[in-house]
């Protein structure tokens, strides 16, 4: 690599620089995925070992009362527009029409999700999409991934080992199917990815990201406006992972980076507690299959205004 950088002439430097940027950002993605894989693998060990016993405990705070932030409808532009790096799936920038909507001030908490469970959430097909209900029955889901009921108390497995469930923390490790079922139960819906991006625009990229040292979602701190838009949990949206209007994959191997995955997956936004702060942005599109829940993923609610 050093030889390549030293010998790269002006005529090839733009192509070299492009590939280096993609490589660095791809490495950040793998650093995040390594943590999610480590957690999944350790959770299958009967001894429930900790990845790190020195992780900071999340603050024992009470999540602020949920309120609703109103956003106007109309024609909005979404997608990446700056000169800094972005993946091809964030482009091209384009216009989209939105009706007025309201977005919850924070993600749904563990305690709020427990109310859904107590009301028979995992046993009522009326809350679930057909494929979601089939998944619940086939995989015998009755709670989020890593939750375990021990002597009448809920525990969850973390990268720091097993911990008692903190009801104030954002719900985590739930699939799109579970998020959609909760929203139906609550009489709300999930935001579209365009709604999420419009809401996040102008907010600083700050929060409980990997550098916080928790490697676990934390309860929201008191504040006005939207909270926890970045970090803590990747937020499910109602949007399927599709190419933006005018998207064209690059030629060669670089064109396979995102385009070939634009099928049967759902978009998540905002990063998580294991995402690098300099890796995330308002236009960033993550994507997973609707049944997957090993990633640090949660959700917030939306409704029509």
Kindly give the residue locations of the regions a language model identified.
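Functional-site microenvironments in short loops/helix caps that host divalent-cation chemistry
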Residues: 23, 29, 33, 37-59, ...
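Acidic interhelical loop/turn segments
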Residues: 1-24, 210
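Short proline/glycine-enriched turn/loop segments at secondary-structure junctions
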Residues: 255-259, 286-293
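Short, structured beta-strand segments at or near domain termini in extracellular proteins/domains
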Residues: 294-305
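Acyl/amide activation-and-transfer machinery of modular secondary-metabolite enzymes
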Residues: 93-99
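Acidic-aromatic/histidine active-site loop/patch
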Residues: 109
């Amino acid at each position: 690599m050093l030889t390549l950088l030293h010998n790269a002439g002006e005529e090839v430097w733009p192509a070299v620089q492009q590939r280096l940027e993609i490589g660095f950002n791809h490495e950040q993605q793998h650093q995040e995925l390594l943590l999610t894989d480590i957690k999944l693998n350790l959770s299958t060990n009967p001894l429930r070992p900790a990845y790190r016993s020195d992780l900071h405990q999340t603050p024992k705070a009470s999540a602020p009362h949920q309120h609703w932030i109103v956003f106007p409808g109309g024609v909005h532009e979404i997608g990446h527009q700056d000169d800094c790096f972005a993946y091809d799936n964030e482009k091209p920038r384009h216009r989209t029409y939105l009706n007025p909507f309201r977005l919850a001030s924070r993600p749904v908490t563990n305690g709020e999700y427990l109310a859904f469970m107590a009301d028979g959430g995992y046993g009522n097909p009326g809350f679930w999409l057909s494929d979601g209900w089939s998944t619940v029955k086939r995989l015998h889901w009755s709670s989020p991934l890593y939750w375990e009921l021990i002597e009448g108390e809920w525990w969850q497995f973390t990268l720091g080992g097993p911990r008692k469930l903190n009801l104030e923390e954002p719900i985590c490790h739930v699939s799109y199917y579970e998020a959609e079922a909760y929203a139906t139960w609550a009489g709300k819906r999930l935001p579209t990815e365009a709604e999420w991006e419009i809401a996040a625009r102008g907010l600083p990229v700050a929060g409980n990201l990997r550098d916080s040292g928790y490697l676990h979602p934390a309860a929201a701190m008191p504040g006005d406006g939207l909270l926890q838009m970045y970090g803590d949990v990747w937020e499910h949206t109602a949007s399927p992972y599709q190419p933006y209007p005018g998207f064209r994959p690059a030629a060669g191997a670089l064109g396979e980076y995102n385009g070939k995955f634009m099928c049967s997956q759902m978009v998540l936004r905002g990063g998580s507690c294991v995402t690098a702060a300099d890796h995330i942005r308002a236009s960033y599109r993550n994507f997973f299959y609707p049944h997957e829940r090993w990633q640090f993923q949660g959700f917030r609610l939306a409704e029509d205004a």
